[in-house]
Every structure is written in structure tokens, then in C-alpha cells.
Amino acid sequence: KEKSSYVVFDLKYESDAVFMGRNDSVSAPYLVPSLGFYDKSGFFADASLSYLTKSEESRIDLFLLTAGYQLNSKKLSGLLSGTKYFFSKDSYSIQSEIEGDLTATLGYDLSLFKISLTASSYFSSNSSTDFFAGIQLDKSIYALDDNLEITPTFNIYGGSQYFYQEYYTYNRLGNRKGKNNAENPSINNSIAIKKVNQFNVLNLEISLPIQFQSNSFLFSFTPHWAFPQSNATITTNETILKEDLKNIFYWSAGISYWLNTKKK
């Protein structure tokens, strides 16, 4: 069937901001509206904002601009994208010191399951670039005349931890930037993660995306179980500590609308 260009309107709720199996000690629930244009050639652009819904800190916490190219054939799929991040100065998100990323993904359908490989680099103005790699295994199961899709998914992620060191320096609870600590130089003194540049397995994650399509609407719900790996050794002026990583359950739910097209 001939491809067509389309616009997607999306509204999603995320129960917490989790990245590489890490999150802040204070949850960051987001309401995320987005608008994307997908050209039939494969090029796309997307804009979204993340509104922090906690009553005591409600604000627009993040604005994202993404552009890239995607390829889809019967067996092979690929994605190349770049994203620019604009975080609120008060954000305590685990990613809040990241300013941009470049990501490439290549997937192949083996019939029994689909395997995807991902490589990405994340940039920050205050530290070196992080490099990550990931492997994903998933299997789509269809029902209700293919309108219902359930996709059991397993991911392994690995990489460096400069982003985590920056988070501990500026945003960890008790060490916040923003309104109360905006010009306080003491909040970023001598915090370091041992072997921050070393490539380690950071997260094992299981998820179960569930999608239901009705005409041009798509309803989705995805539970995630993250099992973080490679506990960081953190050095401060006062002490050296080994962090105690805990497994994380989080979820998202949303509704999307396709304009002038139907999702295949």
C-alpha cells in the first residue's frame, strides 16, 4: 500500500521520570502533550512538553524538539534521530543536565521475536559526552481483528555515567539548583562517581506495551519494571558511599490521534 504523510497529536501521562534504571528520590509525574509530523519519505519532526503535575511544584519542566529519519520494511526497521532538551532550571529529573542526544536504532524481525540494537550519545555543557548501547527483544501479539496489540518487551542498557554525576552534583535532594540554590557555589563541590567513564550494564527492563486502535485513535498503556545495575561509588567532600539501587515500577498511559492517515 502506498505510504502517506500524517500528523499525530498525542497526550500521555507518565508516573515518573526514569532513565537508565535511575530516578530521583522524589517522583516526577508528567503530563506530556506532543505534536509530530511524519513524512512519507521517512523524515519526521516532533515537539513535546512535559508538565510536572505535583501540586506543590506544578510547572512546565521540559520541552523537547526531535527530528530524524525512520525506515520500515517487512523485516527491517531503522531510526536515526536528534533531540534538543530544554529543562526548567528547577527540574530535578534524572536527565535534567542533558542538553541533547543523537540516537540510532536498527531492528530485524526474526518471526519468533524482533531484535533491535540501539546506540546513542548524550550531551551536556558541564561534562563529557555519555555513550549508551542497548538491546531490545520484543514480540507483538494481536487480537480483536488486529486492533489490539500487546508487546512483551525486554531491554538491556549499558553506558557511561556522566549524566548521573551531573545529576548528583546539581539536582539530588538536598543539593538542588533552582530557586533556593541558584547562585550557591557550594552545591556543586567535589562530587564524583568512581569510573564514571567506564561502560557498564546500567539497566535491565521488562515492559508490556498495550495498544488499542479505533479508527484514527490509539489508546495505550505501558507498565515498566526496571532493575538497575552497577551501583555507583560516589565521592563527596565528607564521605565515600556506595549507592543502594532499588527496582522501580512505573507506567504510562496515553491517547493519540492520526490526522489524514490510519496507523498500520
Kindly label every feature range from the protein language model:
Residues 9-15, 37, 45-49, 80-84, ...:
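Transmembrane beta-barrel strands of outer-membrane/channel proteins
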Residues 20-29, 44, 51-62, 86-98, ...:
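Solvent-exposed loop/turn segments connecting transmembrane beta-strands
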Residues 41-46, 74-80, 111-117, 144-149, ...:
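Repeated loop/turn-to-beta-strand initiation elements of outer-membrane beta-barrel proteins
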